[in-house]
Amino acid sequence: MRVGVFDSGLGGLTVVQALSRVIKGADIFYVADTKHAPYGEKTPEQILQYSLNITAYFLDEHQIDVLIIACNTATSAAVKTLRERYPELIIIGTEPGIKPALEQTRTKNIGVLATPATLVGEKYQDLVNVLSAKEEVTLYEQACPGLVEQIENGEIESGKTHDMLEGWLHPMRENDVDTIVLGCTHYPLVAHKIEEIMKREMNLIHTGDAIAKRLLALAEEKGYENRGKFSLCIMSTAKIDQEIIKQIIPEYDCFKFISVKTSNF
């Protein structure tokens, strides 16, 4: 099974981590589109174009069987069009884990950390409207501009990152939030900082494990055998620090810079 995974940067490697725990026989091709990061500050039209170009690259260069959009923002902007354009390709998107958050919260106060684009996206708004209509909960939504850049630059432990998180999380701490949805695949990389600032153990909802389970189920349904070697090739569209990659995924089979052809679809 050949699987293409992409994100605007390194955050999607948290999804690859989850895949590696349950998927055995798969060749994973990961594209970090660092040239255009962060997606959360781009227009939906731009994000759709990036997503179409990367998908075409995966199909032309690596003949993938499965595409995983390891980015909430790109899922919102592109998954519908990609499924229409490539009906034979298995496509798995990433959505904020509102449903599991509703199942796990005790205080009925839920925080959502996400990029600005995800919070205003139609897919997220529809999900919130449907699920919150069934449950009496209070959502504390917080856009986190600049956090992806801090993570990409290896500044997770910096004072600036701490101050940013402190400002965003203070209202949640004061309002007895016990569950926080990590609405961007980069954010699990600062999970320990979130718990430190919240000053208590939290339910932190990340969808990587759900994506891995979905892929395993689809693989079995399509007759792919879950055995053999798990291989990972990481590619980037711009310069990136491999030391940061190794902090997330210590072992991988290859790394290279690539140029994704820009096409007008």
Swiss-Prot record:
Keyword Transit peptide: no
Binding site for substrate: 7-8, 39-40, 72-73, 185-186
EC numbers for this chain: 5.1.1.3
Protein name, UniProt field: Glutamate racemase
Catalytic activity: L-glutamate = D-glutamate
Molecular-function annotations in GO: glutamate racemase activity
First-level EC class: isomerase
Keywords annotated in UniProt: Cell shape, Cell wall biogenesis/degradation, Isomerase, Peptidoglycan synthesis
GO terms of biological process kind: cell wall organization; peptidoglycan biosynthetic process; regulation of cell shape
UniProt pathway: Cell wall biogenesis; peptidoglycan biosynthesis
Organism listed in the record: Sulfurovum sp. (strain NBC37-1)
Domain of life of the native organism: Bacteria
PANTHER family documented for this protein: GLUTAMATE RACEMASE
Family recorded in the similarity comment: Belongs to the aspartate/glutamate racemases family.
Function: Provides the (R)-glutamate required for cell wall biosynthesis.
Active-site residues (renumbered): 71, 184
The keyword Nucleotidyltransferase appears for this protein: no
Classification of source organism: Bacteria, Pseudomonadati, Campylobacterota, Epsilonproteobacteria, Campylobacterales
